[in-house]
Amino acid sequence: MQKVLWLILLVAFTLLIFLNSSLPMSDSGRLSSMAAAFLGQLLDVAGISVEGNLEHLLRKLAHFTAFAVQGGLLCRTFSEFRIANRAANGYVLFLGLLTAVVDEYIQSFSAGRTSAVNDVLLDFSGTLSMWLAYRIWQWSRH
């Protein structure tokens, strides 16, 4: 039963990534602006000043985080299905990179948005970071 639950979570989260990529820039920008304004107020209250474009930084951090979450879901799903680590490593990294490429491809068709190789690398670095953290965690348990 847990196998199916992890697989459903993985598929649902991946679809959510693709859904967010299909949003026009106006909708995506509005969400980012609201989040940046809220975070900016929190930082002001805490006495922390941020130089530069907080919205841009927040968008990039959200991409990294989303792909890190997906990387964790990929690792856990393959673990639940008892796929050998060596094979699972390849599958996790390949599927993480594939998701990043497809995500940017979808985004290229969304109004007001573009795709960039740098974004694929940023997205994949989230997957790679979580995969590495997961493997270190697994190794430390033995």
Where are these regions (language model features)?
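Interfacial helix-loop-helix junctions of multi-pass membrane proteins
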Residues: 100-124
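Transmembrane helix-loop junctions in multipass membrane proteins, especially transporters and channels
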Residues: 25-29, 79-82, 108, 112, ...
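Small-polar-interrupted transmembrane alpha-helices in polytopic inner-membrane proteins
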Residues: 12-17, 88-108
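Membrane-interface helix-boundary motifs at transmembrane edges
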Residues: 1-2, 79-87
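Membrane-interfacial alpha-helical segments at the cytosolic side of multi-pass membrane proteins
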Residues: 66-81, 125-139
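Alpha-helical transmembrane segments of multi-pass integral membrane proteins
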Residues: 2, 59-62, 91-96, 119-123
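"…centered on the first transmembrane helix and the immediately adjacent amphipathic helix/loop
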Residues: 1-72
